[in-house]
Amino acid sequence: MDNKCFELGANEQPLDIIKETCGFAGIFKQIGVIGDSLASGEFESHDENGSIVYTDMYEYSWPAVLERITGTKYNNYSRGGMTAREYMQSWADANGFWQWNQAYIIALGNNDSFVCGHPLGSVKDVNAECPQDNADTFFGNMGKIVCKLKTIEPNARIFVVTPQLRGEACDKDIRYIASELAKLCDMFDFTYLLDMTAHAPVYDAEMRK
């Protein structure tokens, strides 16, 4: 067997090679996704009165696409407008979303500060040994989510996704979120950063059209 296919090329970046088969994304049998509209497949449309309506279209979401490509079962717990606070304090419990999965992808942070005005805080708000003491900040609630998932499956692989840059004034905060999320990942076993801030295209007004 030629093991060179598993080796990184010189100066290779995470998104330089995107395989149509999704590569090793199919190594898991079941993945849970916790996110906002960017994970729920949310569509914007107009009703009969011309008012804008937002609808979660899970069958068009990227977890649904990955499920079709890889054969991995994706449980999508996302919803448009979701925040770490709402997911931890009400949404997951109300919908029975604290479920076992082999791996989890957490993609939150777009709404928490920029839309809802929740305080970001820092990883100093996270007590991995006693999460009930975490501060009610974005990072405090993110820490609670990771801790809760670890109680469900201690060996779960958890992938934390950072927000994309937007080419706007908030980019400074986005870079801060990414740097703190990297520290959060270091606090837990089998917890990894998917750094969209550093490697994904800028999610500016043109891209959002």
Where are these regions (language model features)?
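Active-site-proximal beta-strand/loop segments in catalytic clefts of secreted hydrolases
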Residues: 34-37, 77-82, 107-110, 161-165, ...
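A generic structural signal for well-ordered alpha-helical segments
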Residues: 66-67, 149, 184-186
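Catalytic His-Asp segment of secreted/periplasmic serine-dependent ester chemistry enzymes
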Residues: 164-209
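Conserved SGNH/GDSL esterase-like catalytic core that processes O-acyl groups on lipids
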Residues: 30, 41-140
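Generic structural signal for well-ordered alpha-helices
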Residues: 142-146, 178
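Conserved, well-ordered alpha-helix/loop/beta-strand core segments that scaffold catalytic motifs
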Residues: 107-109, 159, 174, 190
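Proline-centered flexible-loop/turn and helix-kink motifs
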Residues: 154-155, 189
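N-terminal secretory targeting modules
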Residues: 1-58, 67-68, 97-100, 151-154
